[in-house]
């Protein structure tokens, strides 16, 4: 199960992305306010959208099960996890993030740690951070 939970603008900028895109709903007026998706992003287009939405409106977490998706070794999320961070860091920099913040630190440390961990352990760790 995806480790979804409440988040906000500040936590998103720290890299706490706990929003499963399959179950994300938002108002059409918010989409008109912040949309569309930025086509320059391939891996972090949803992260960019969540940050822009959180900047103009509170995000509300509902703990009900709204959707399912399959997470396996061939998904972009897992197979190219290291390629998402450079795009997330572009969003972070655009929002005024500092080079010594939590997200840049995670971006540097995660490839070193995750290279040695099996998939199930990586998924378990993801729930903790």
Locations of the language-model features?
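Conserved nucleotide-sugar donor-binding catalytic segment
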Residues: 1-87, 91
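Membrane-proximal basic amphipathic "stem/tether" segments
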Residues: 93-129
């Amino acid at each position: 199960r995806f480790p979804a939970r409440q988040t906000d603008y500040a936590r998103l900028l720290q890299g706490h992305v706990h929003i499963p895109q399959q179950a994300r709903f938002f108002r059409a007026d918010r989409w008109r306010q912040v949309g569309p998706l930025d086509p320059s992003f391939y891996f972090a287009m949803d992260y960019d959208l969540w940050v822009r939405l959180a900047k103009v409106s509170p995000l509300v977490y509902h703990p009900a099960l709204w959707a399912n998706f399959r997470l396996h070794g061939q998904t972009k999320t897992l197979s190219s996890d290291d390629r998402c961070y450079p795009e997330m860091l572009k969003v972070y920099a655009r929002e005024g993030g500092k080079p010594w913040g939590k997200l840049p630190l995670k971006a540097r440390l995660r490839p070193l740690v995750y290279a040695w961990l099996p998939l199930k352990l990586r998924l378990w760790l993801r729930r903790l951070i």
